[in-house]
């Protein structure tokens, strides 16, 4: 079907959904927020540019979290989403067993996305990723107050290990690697295992913009609300260009035509 809106986001709780919706609005996107998956027959209003669905998958059992998330992402695609975003907390927490990996795995497998990125950071709130490790106000996640959270305890700070504890696929830290190096590693893992995760460092606000531009050609993102704003700004640029020209301007949207060679790239 004809693509109707720029990005569809599934958030793992209502608070996070409200946060990411507000960041999309801040980025300049006309945004609609749903509490739960809309009923059959409901259609996204004309002119909508971003759609956010709030679930309860952060603390659900794994099977239900995956099932609900796939239904939500499927509905977004059916309604015409060009890109997908899985929003989770900036401290990367879910249940003790972990729901982030299973949900992201399932989305990549079901919809055919070879890899995605993990971007939980929100530097303005002290959540940063440096050398592949997640910090809360300068303290490693495992040493922060999240360590003994009653519902979502976090006792590991390295995102590669965190995702591999939950996922069937490996996480690749991009820290200290050239683009040629991490790209080769990603392509090798995807060829051997089918899917993988890339983990960029993100400890300054400017990094979010750089990451969004570097990965403007992928369809499925995962991260916190802060990174969603940077993705949203790129898409808002594209929306403005589309309105002005009504032609294929995908290269303009991310500023690097060679990475985005077709209309849906950005």
Predicted feature locations:
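Short, structured active-site "lid" loops
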Residues: 48-65
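Short, hydrophobic/glycine-enriched beta-strand segments
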Residues: 7-11, 116-118, 198-199, 220-222, ...
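Short, solvent-exposed amphipathic alpha-helical segments in soluble enzyme
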Residues: 23-27, 70, 135, 212-218, ...
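N-terminal basic/disordered segments at the start of proteins
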Residues: 2-47, 67-69, 121-124
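Short glycine/serine/threonine-rich phosphate/pyrophosphate-binding segments
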Residues: 16-20, 208, 230
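Acidic, glycine-rich loop-and-beta core segments that form the ion-binding/anion-interacting portion
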Residues: 216-258, 263-266
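Short glycine-centered, acidic/aromatic-flanked micro-motifs in structured strand/loop junctions
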Residues: 11, 55-57, 88-90
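Cap/lid and interdomain-hinge subdomains that line or gate substrate/regulatory clefts
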Residues: 3-5, 30, 49, 65, ...
């Amino acid at each position: 079907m004809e693509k109707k809106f720029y990005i569809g986001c599934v958030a793992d709780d209502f608070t996070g959904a409200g946060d990411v919706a507000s960041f999309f609005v801040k980025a300049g996107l006309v945004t609609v927020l749903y509490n739960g998956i809309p009923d059959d027959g409901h259609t996204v209003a004309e002119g909508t540019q971003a759609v956010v669905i709030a679930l309860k998958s952060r603390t659900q059992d794994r099977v239900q979290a995956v099932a609900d998330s796939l239904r939500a992402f499927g509905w977004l695609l059916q309604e015409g989403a060009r890109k997908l975003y899985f929003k989770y907390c900036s401290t990367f927490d879910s249940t003790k067993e972990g729901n982030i990996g299973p949900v992201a795995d399932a989305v990549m497998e079901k919809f055919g996305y070879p890899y995605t990125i993990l971007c939980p950071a929100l530097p303005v709130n002290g959540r940063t990723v440096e050398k592949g490790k997640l910090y809360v106000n300068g303290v490693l996640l495992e040493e922060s107050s999240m360590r003994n959270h009653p519902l979502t305890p976090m006792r590991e700070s390295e995102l590669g290990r965190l995702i591999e504890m939950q996922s069937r696929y490996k996480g690749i830290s991009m820290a200290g690697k050239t683009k040629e190096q991490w790209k080769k590693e990603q392509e090798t893992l995807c060829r051997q295992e089918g899917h993988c995760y890339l983990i960029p460092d993100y400890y300054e606000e400017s990094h979010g913009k750089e990451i969004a531009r570097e990965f403007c050609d992928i369809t499925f993102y995962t991260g916190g609300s802060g990174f969603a704003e940077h993705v949203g700004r790129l898409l808002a640029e594209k929306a403005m260009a589309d309105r002005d020209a009504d032609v294929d301007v995908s290269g303009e949207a991310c500023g690097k035509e060679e990475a985005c060679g077709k209309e849906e790239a950005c």
